[in-house]
Amino acid sequence: MTTYDDVDYDPEVVNIRPAATVMLVDDRPDLQVFMMERNAATVFAGGMWVFPGGAVEHEDHPELLGDITMGRTDADTSKLMAIPSGGIAYYVTAIREAFEEAGVLLAHAPGEDQL
């Protein structure tokens, strides 16, 4: 079992950063949820079962995205999340992290509605 007795996660000491997490759920009758086991050597949550996710990066922000958000705007996504702005960056982060960490690409071809 991994312990963190010698690690300080006090928010006054550790910088808290905006981050996004993805829950992938298969809604068949036997409900399945996709999770990953983190490498035991990882300092933060090593050996733990987690959902794919991670920190919002500068490149995830809307002014750098171009026309890849399929009509979703920062204003729309921010309103859904009840935050003043930056909502679209959380969406982009979730998609990017799902692919980087788990190889799951949450996307569809232009003109298609299915992932």
In which residue ranges do the predicted regions lie?
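N-terminal leader/linker segments that precede catalytic domains of diphosphate-processing enzymes
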Residues: 1-115
